[in-house]
């Protein structure tokens, strides 16, 4: 059993990674409330659980007070020697601005008072504590969806199947 935590700035490819893992047999949860991470980990690592691999996305859509607790929760889980992998996806701000303008989606932190650039910068600050704890960081700035899929398959899924640790 393994718990994979996917985090990163909006527009960096987290949903794509979750879909890839789901296609490979992972049980995936997008936008898990950070306050439920500890409970989920306890459930995943009990003897009764038959789910071999779980992947969750935790990002800036969370309540900020809950998001601030993620590093403490991750440290607690790591101290228990649980098999947890933290993958942090990112892209440079210019690429994220372009992706949001092309998709016409609203950034989760933007509103009538906070523009897109400011929201992207704020998100970097919010997610920095998770970023520094990651076991794998992937910069998707110059990656196509196809390249990201191949990278995830090669670095995570196939290495898991052969028992190679990243």
What residue spans do the PLM features occupy?
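Hydrophobic anchor at the beta1->P-loop junction of P-loop NTPases
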Residues: 6
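P-loop (Walker A) phosphate-binding loop of NTP-binding proteins
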Residues: 9, 21
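Post-Walker A alpha-helix
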Residues: 17-18
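Conserved nucleotide-sensing/catalytic segment adjacent to the nucleotide-binding pocket
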Residues: 24, 28-75
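Switch/connector loops and helix/strand junctions flanking conserved nucleotide-binding motifs
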Residues: 64-66, 93-100, 127, 146
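Conserved phosphate-donor/acceptor-positioning beta-strand/loop module used by diverse small-molecule
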Residues: 80-104, 138-139
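C-terminal accessory "lid"/substrate-recognition subdomains
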Residues: 118-166
């Amino acid at each position: 059993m393994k718990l994979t935590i996917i985090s990163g700035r909006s527009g960096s490819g987290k949903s794509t990674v979750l879909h890839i893992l789901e296609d490979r047999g992972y049980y995936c949860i997008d936008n898990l409330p950070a306050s439920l991470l500890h409970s989920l980990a306890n459930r995943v690592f009990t003897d009764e659980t038959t789910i071999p691999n779980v992947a969750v996305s935790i990002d800036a859509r969370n309540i900020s007070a809950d998001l601030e607790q993620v590093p403490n929760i991750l440290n607690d889980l790591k101290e228990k020697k649980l098999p947890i992998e933290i993958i942090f996806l990112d892209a440079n701000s210019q690429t994220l601005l372009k992706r949001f303008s092309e998709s016409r989606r609203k950034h989760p932190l933007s509103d009538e008072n906070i523009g897109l650039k400011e929201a992207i910068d704020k998100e970097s600050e919010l997610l920095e504590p998770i970023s520094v704890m990651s076991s794998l960081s992937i910069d998707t700035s110059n990656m196509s969806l196809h390249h990201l899929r191949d990278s995830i398959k090669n670095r995570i899924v196939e290495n898991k199947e052969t028992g190679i640790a990243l």
